Amino acid sequence: MQMKFRGRVWKFGDNVDTDQIIPARYLNTSDPYELAKHVMEDSEHPEFAKEHKEGDIIVAGKNFGSGSSREHAPIAIKYSGVPVVIAKSFARIFFRNAINIGLPIVEAPEAVDEIEHGDEIEVDLEKGVIKNLRTGKEYQATKFPKELQDILKAGGLMAYAKEKLASK
């Protein structure tokens, strides 16, 4: 998995929960591409699933991914083509589920405060840097420990475990 991304921002507020990310009415499927068709459907941007482009980046406030422990939520985001989610903070279970399935997530409160809907940004996960291309300003994000970077580079926890087992 690449560790640098560039995309247009979709800005969301605080407390975006898993029901907003992927509504419960779609939990009868485990097809990630079907889930992606409905991502963010019950959020403040219900048009997101139909109007976002592959590579667009979600930027949100605090407590992103709160609510029920639903692995469908990060899966829907990942398979919709969103390469990274930036937020002030993440619900802990969402954080872990995202890492496990290989969806990069970044905590950067200052960046969230200043980046606007529609801005184009660059994200470098290895350096922990976010750059707003509209303003030229760079923000330091909370950098992942090497172990989490390795899991993300592998594409998720299962892929990482397979790599580790194969190398023994």
Swiss-Prot record:
GO molecular function: 3-isopropylmalate dehydratase activity
GO biological process: L-leucine biosynthetic process
UniProt KW Cell inner membrane keyword: no
InterPro entries (UniProt xref): Aconitase/3IPM_dehydase_swvl, AconitaseA/IPMdHydase_ssu_swvl, IPMI_Swivel, LeuD, LeuD/DmdB_bac, LeuD_type2/HacB/DmdB
Catalytic activity: (2R,3S)-3-isopropylmalate = (2S)-2-isopropylmalate
Highest taxon above the source species: Bacteria
Covalent S-S links between cysteines: none
SUPFAM superfamilies, sorted: LeuD/IlvD-like
Keyword terms, alphabetized: Amino-acid biosynthesis, Branched-chain amino acid biosynthesis, Leucine biosynthesis, Lyase
Listed pathway(s): Amino-acid biosynthesis; L-leucine biosynthesis; L-leucine from 3-methyl-2-oxobutanoate: step 2/4
EC number: 4.2.1.33
Family (UniProt): Belongs to the LeuD family. LeuD type 2 subfamily.
Biological role stated in the UniProt entry: Catalyzes the isomerization between 2-isopropylmalate and 3-isopropylmalate, via the formation of 2-isopropylmaleate.
Assembly mode: Heterodimer of LeuC and LeuD.
Protein name: 3-isopropylmalate dehydratase small subunit
Gene: leuD
